[in-house]
């Protein structure tokens, strides 16, 4: 995963762990995070022109074509924001409802910390899939955004993402 990609033979953070002493020491990770921002019912657009009495294979083909057409229209309606979003259209209730999920995609993700593997592997049994299982398998990443809190490519001037809501 992401930590393996950041590890090298000279700096094996997978084995030795890593904790950034400050934000400048955080390491850019090679993945994106999508935050679900909106769900829109697009059933009428997807099922427009689909005959009720079609056989299953023909209906599936027609629905797939309508989903692609609807997705294209929905993405185009985003205007300049379309580069910051991924839209997925999913089928619900056996193809009787279709919802478009709008994910705002943040591309500047940085590793803050991960413990050394020795914290989770001790006692000679590293893969105990039975309880009790004692391990410390986690890592911390921070999302960065541009000065107006919107997605941006990596830039040292980016600021930590400020969520609208958080746990107290």
Model-derived regions: residue spans:
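Terminal presequence/propeptide segments associated with secretion/organelle targeting
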Residues: 1-168
């Amino acid at each position: 995963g992401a930590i393996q990609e950041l590890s090298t033979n000279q700096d094996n953070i997978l084995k030795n762990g890593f904790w950034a002493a400050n934000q400048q020491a955080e390491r850019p990770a090679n993945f994106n995070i999508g935050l679900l921002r909106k769900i829109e019912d697009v059933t009428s657009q997807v099922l427009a022109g689909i005959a009720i009495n079609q056989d299953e294979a023909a209906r599936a083909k027609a629905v797939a074509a309508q989903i692609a057409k609807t997705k294209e229209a929905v993405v185009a309606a985003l205007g300049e924001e379309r580069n910051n979003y991924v839209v997925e259209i999913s089928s619900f209730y056996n193809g009787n409802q279709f919802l478009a999920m709008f994910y705002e995609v943040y591309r500047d993700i940085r590793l803050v910390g991960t413990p050394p593997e020795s914290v989770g592997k001790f006692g000679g049994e590293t893969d105990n899939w039975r309880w009790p299982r004692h391990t410390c398998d986690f890592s911390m990443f921070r999302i960065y955004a541009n000065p107006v809190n919107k997605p941006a490519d990596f830039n040292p001037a980016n600021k930590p993402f400020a969520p609208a809501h958080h746990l107290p």
